[in-house]
Amino acid sequence: MGMRMMFTVFLLVVLATTVVSFTSDRASDGRKAAAKDKASDLVALTVKGCCSHPACSVNNPDICG
C-alpha cells in the first residue's frame, strides 16, 4: 500500500469515528431531555397531590398558592 493510500484510509477512519461519535452524542442528548421531562412531570404530580391535601397545602403556601 502506498503512502497516499494509507493517508486516505486514515482520513476515512477519522471521519467515520467523528460521525459515529457525533450521532451517538446527539442521541444521548435526546435521552437526557426525555428523562428531564419525566422528572418535571413527576414533580408536578407530586405538587398537585400535596395541594389537594389541606394539611400539606397549609404547610406549603408558596407552592399551592
Swiss-Prot record:
GO cellular component: extracellular region; host cell postsynaptic membrane
Subcellular location: Secreted
Reported effect, P61A: Decrease in inhibitory activity towards human alpha-9-alpha-10 nAChR
Positions bearing Cysteine amide: C64
Annotated effect of mutating S52R: Increase in inhibitory activity towards human alpha-9-alpha-10 nAChR
GO molecular function: acetylcholine receptor inhibitor activity; ion channel regulator activity; toxin activity
Effect of S57 to A/G: No change in inhibitory activity towards human alpha-9-alpha-10 nAChR
Effect of D62 to A/E/S: Decrease in inhibitory activity towards human alpha-9-alpha-10 nAChR
Region (Ser-Xaa-Pro motif, crucial for potent interaction with nAChR): 52-54
Keywords: Acetylcholine receptor inhibiting toxin, Amidation, Disulfide bond, Ion channel impairing toxin, Neurotoxin, Postsynaptic neurotoxin, Secreted, Signal, Toxin
SS bond partners: C50-C56, C51-C64
Pro-piece positions: 22-48
Signal peptide: 1-21
Expressing tissues: Expressed by the venom duct.
Biotech / industrial applications: The S52Dap (S4Dap) analog has potential as a candidate for drug development candidate to treat neuropathic pain. It is also much more selective for human alpha-9-alpha-10 than the native peptide (a9a10 (IC(50)=4.0 nM) > a3a2 (IC(50)=20.6 nM) > a7 (IC(50)=259.1 nM)). In addition, in a rat neuropathic pain model, it shows potent analgesic activity, superior to that of the native peptide.
Effect of N59 to A/Q: Decrease in inhibitory activity towards human alpha-9-alpha-10 nAChR
Similarity field: Belongs to the conotoxin A superfamily.
Entry's free-text remark on domains: The cysteine framework is I (CC-C-C). Alpha4/7 pattern.
Note: Negative results: does not or very weakly inhibit mouse muscle alpha-1-beta-1-gamma-delta/CHRNA1-CHRNB1-CHRNG-CHRND nAChRs. Does not or very weakly inhibit rat neuronal alpha-6/alpha-3-beta-4 (CHRNA6/CHRNA3-CHRNB4), alpha-3-beta-4/CHRNA3-CHRNB4, alpha-4-beta-2/CHRNA4-CHRNB2 and alpha-4-beta-4/CHRNA4-CHRNB4 nAChRs. Does not or weakly inhibit human alpha-1-beta-1-delta-epsilon/CHRNA1-CHRNB1-CHRND-CHRNE, alpha-4-beta-2/CHRNA4-CHRNB2, and alpha-7/CHRNA7 nAChRs.
Cited function: Alpha-conotoxins act on postsynaptic membranes, they bind to the nicotinic acetylcholine receptors (nAChR) and thus inhibit them. This toxin potently and reversibly inhibits alpha-9-alpha-10/CHRNA9-CHRNA10 (IC(50)=92 nM (human) and IC(50)=8.3 nM (rat)) and human alpha3-beta-2/CHRNA3-CHRNB2 nAChR (IC(50)=218.9 nM). Also moderately inhibits human alpha-3-beta-4/CHRNA3-CHRNB4 (60% inhibition at 1 uM), rat alpha-7/CHRNA7 (65% inhibition at 1 uM) and rat alpha-3-beta-2/CHRNA3-CHRNB2 nAChR (50-70% inhibition at 10 uM). In two rat pain models, this toxin shows analgesic effect.
The protein, known as: Alpha-conotoxin Mr1.1
Species of provenance: Conus marmoreus (Marble cone)
